[in-house]
């Protein structure tokens, strides 16, 4: 085995000297065993990833764990390969760190479980699927107005407490129940408490059995936060390439991936770029995002929560992410305050799949009519607030009348929220969604009370609820 020794420790950056001509390759993992301070202390293994070659015999590495207690002269062992993580069935229902070590207090991962390196090339052109397929989620507002593409990348925007986590859980549940699909959740630089809550909520709702979770949270060194998204993606790619699955990959939060890269870049001594970000920002983002795609075998569809610093959409971090997105799902606090769940903004959410060539003429036409009706209602709200409904023309009154029904019908009960609401969750196929909204637009249900449309699934449930209310 190729061994070197530590010559310098600068926070999470460690320099290691090897014999001349025996430098480990870039991205190789080095192992350093930190001997316990006394006989009762446990020896700790720190993993370092090679980032730079310094001259003929030294490398600069980034630590994946705490470097507290590392000293010059400590031996570092070159593993001869990049960091690798366990893949396949053994990962389902488990929680891992960036190195693929189980952190859920369960049994350690068996030694014979297959492991894949986290650094790999994106699929080649000839492997990519050329057809654009819609991923049915069973969530009406998403399927109708901002449909997800298999192998696409979706940005999830929303402040605290508007329902990002519940929406993520419902997507995991629906993909598992209706499509038998696998989900991988990568927690990148977010709060440990949120990860813990999510794990327990998913265990309670039963979706954990179809999910692998990887966490590199806020308290971790920047190296771990920068690489944990790749660890999660590697697990997802295995399910796509070996098992032909349509996999959902959740990344929460993609901004923290960029932020960690910026910290590492500064520590490695690179010249900062705009707003202090790393000069390699676009390259790093591209290397991650290009691996998320659909091939002829299966697909990895990614849903990425995106934090926008100071609500500035021109900031280089979110702006670089936008270039890769196929759809956006915007959560709006005003809607959640009105009790409309999921609180997805039907006018701000977008998808490049919403075109007649991809979703079909009928779907496109109904979606656009729904948006036009809601937009007109939005414009009339100021007049209603000042003068009241009586001052509107008959035509405008009808628009408001239908828009409110549409707005309520965009809500639905979620399976994962059943234990809190006591209401049965609903999965609505796209055909049923289109049929329901088409009939509302045609005025077929103008006589039914508004409340009959709130938090229901299919249009038949509205009719049933309306009869009970009459």
UniProtKB/Swiss-Prot annotation:
Reactions catalysed, as given in the entry: ATP + H2O + 4 H(+)(in) = ADP + phosphate + 5 H(+)(out)
GO molecular function per UniProt: ATP binding; ATP hydrolysis activity; proton-transporting ATP synthase activity, rotational mechanism
SMART domains per UniProt: AAA
Matches recorded under Pfam families: ATP-synt_ab, ATP-synt_ab_N, ATP-synt_VA_C
GO (cellular component) term, any one: plasma membrane
Domain of life: Bacteria
Residues binding ATP, per UniProt: 158-165
UniProt-listed CDD domains: ATP-synt_F1_beta_C, ATP-synt_F1_beta_N, F1-ATPase_beta_CD
Enzyme Commission code: 7.1.2.2
InterPro entries: AAA+_ATPase, ATP-synt_VA_C, ATP_synth_F1_bsu, ATPase_a/bsu_AS, ATPase_alpha/beta_chains, ATPase_F1/V1/A1_a/bsu_N, ATPase_F1/V1/A1_a/bsu_N_sf, ATPase_F1/V1/A1_a/bsu_nucl-bd
Enzyme class: translocase
Keyword tags: ATP synthesis, ATP-binding, Cell membrane, CF(1), Hydrogen ion transport, Ion transport, Membrane, Nucleotide-binding, Translocase, Transport
Coiled-coil stretches: none
Membrane topology: Peripheral membrane protein
Compartment annotation: Cell membrane
Subunit structure as annotated in this protein's UniProt entry: F-type ATPases have 2 components, CF(1) - the catalytic core - and CF(0) - the membrane proton channel. CF(1) has five subunits: alpha(3), beta(3), gamma(1), delta(1), epsilon(1). CF(0) has three main subunits: a(1), b(2) and c(9-12). The alpha and beta chains form an alternating ring which encloses part of the gamma chain. CF(1) is attached to CF(0) by a central stalk formed by the gamma and epsilon chains, while a peripheral stalk is formed by the delta and b chains.
Job of this protein: Produces ATP from ADP in the presence of a proton gradient across the membrane. The catalytic sites are hosted primarily by the beta subunits.
Family per record: Belongs to the ATPase alpha/beta chains family.
Protein's UniProt name: ATP synthase subunit beta
Lineage: Bacteria, Bacillati, Bacillota, Bacilli, Bacillales
């Amino acid at each position: 085995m190729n061994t070197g020794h530590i010559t310098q420790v600068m926070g999470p950056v460690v320099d290691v000297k090897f014999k001349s001509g025996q430098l480990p390759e870039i991205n190789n993992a080095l192992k350093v065993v930190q001997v316990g301070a006394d006989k009762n202390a446990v020896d700790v293994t720190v993993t370092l990833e090679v980032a730079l070659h310094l001259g003929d015999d030294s490398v600069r590495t980034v630590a994946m764990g705490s470097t507290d207690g590392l000293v010059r002269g400590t031996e570092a062992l070159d593993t001869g390969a990049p960091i690798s993580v366990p893949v396949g069935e053994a990962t389902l229902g488990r929680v891992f760190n960036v190195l693929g070590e189980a952190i859920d207090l369960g049994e350690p991962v068996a030694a014979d479980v297959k492991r894949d390196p986290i650094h790999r090339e994106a699929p080649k052109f000839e492997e990519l699927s050329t057809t654009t397929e819609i991923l049915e989620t069973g969530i009406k507002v998403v399927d109708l107005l901002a449909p997800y593409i298999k192998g696409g990348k979706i940005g999830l925007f929303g402040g605290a407490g508007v329902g990002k986590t519940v929406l993520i859980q419902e997507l995991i549940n629906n993909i598992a129940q209706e499509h038998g699909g696998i989900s991988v959740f990568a927690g990148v630089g977010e709060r440990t408490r949120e990860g813990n809550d999510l794990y327990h909520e998913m265990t309670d709702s039963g979706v954990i059995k179809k999910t692998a979770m990887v966490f590199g949270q806020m308290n971790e060194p920047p190296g771990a936060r920068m690489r944990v998204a790749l660890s999660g993606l590697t697990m997802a790619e295995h399910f796509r390439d070996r098992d032909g699955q349509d996999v959902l990959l959740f990344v929460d939060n993609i901004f923290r991936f960029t932020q960690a890269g910026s910290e590492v870049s500064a520590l490695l001594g690179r010249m900062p770029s705009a707003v202090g970000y790393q000069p390699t920002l676009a390259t790093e983002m591209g290397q991650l995002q290009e691996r998320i795609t659909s091939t002829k075998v299966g697909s990895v569809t990614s849903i990425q929560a995106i934090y926008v610093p100071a609500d500035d959409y021109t900031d280089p971090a979110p702006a670089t992410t936008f270039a890769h997105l196929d759809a956006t799902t915007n959560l709006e606090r005003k809607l959640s305050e009105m009790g409309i769940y999921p609180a997805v903004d039907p006018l701000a959410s977008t998808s490049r799949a919403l075109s007649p060539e991809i979703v079909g003429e009928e779907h496109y036409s109904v979606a656009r009519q729904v948006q036009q009706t809601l937009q007109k209602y939005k414009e009339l709200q100021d007049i209603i607030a000042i003068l009241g409904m009586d001052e509107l023309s008959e035509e405008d009154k009808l628009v408001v009348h239908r828009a409110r029904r549409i707005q309520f019908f965009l809500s639905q009960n979620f399976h994962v929220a059943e234990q809190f609401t006591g209401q049965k969750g609903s999965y609505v196929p796209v055909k049923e969604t289109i049929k329901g909204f088409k009939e509302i637009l045609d005025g077929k249900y103008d006589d039914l009370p508004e409340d009959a449309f709130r938090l229901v699934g299919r249009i038949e449930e509205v009719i049933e609820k309306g009869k009970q209310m009459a």
